[in-house]
């Protein structure tokens, strides 16, 4: 996978898969972002990650968080990192063992 250093990262963590799917759908419809990952964290928590330009990621995460809240009590956290440091990138692409 090529490096995406300098491209914003948006994250939404949910309780359950349904709010995560709703958030992912809303994020990709709201702005020009790329859905890069879905992680099953454990205990029913799911994290969805998107990448794109900072403004687009900001709009996408807001839309995803709103959609997730409409599904019920699914939203745990929503966060944006405008320009992740290059040392963070390997953590995002680690393969599961």
Swiss-Prot record:
One Pfam match: BMC
Subcellular compartments: Carboxysome
GO cellular component: carboxysome
Sequence ranges assigned to domain BMC in this UniProt record: 8-93
Location (main, coarse): other
InterPro entries xrefs: Bact_microcomp_CS, BMC_dom, BMC_shell, CcmK-like_sf, CcmK/CsoS1_BMC
GO terms, biological process: carbon fixation
Keyword set, alphabetical order: Bacterial microcompartment, Carbon dioxide fixation, Carboxysome
Keyword Lipoprotein: no
Domain statement: The tight homohexamer forms a small pore which is positively charged.
Assembly information from the UniProt record: Homohexamer with a small central pore.
Family of the protein in this entry: Belongs to the bacterial microcompartments protein family. CsoS1 subfamily.
Functional note: One of shell proteins of the carboxysome, a polyhedral inclusion where RuBisCO (ribulose bisphosphate carboxylase, ccbL-ccbS) is sequestered. Assembles into hexamers which make sheets that form the facets of the polyhedral carboxysome. The shell probably limits the diffusion of CO(2) into and out of the carboxysome.
Name used for this protein in its record: Carboxysome shell protein CsoS1B
Species assigned in the record: Hydrogenovibrio crunogenus (strain DSM 25203 / XCL-2) (Thiomicrospira crunogena)
Gene it is expressed from: csoS1B
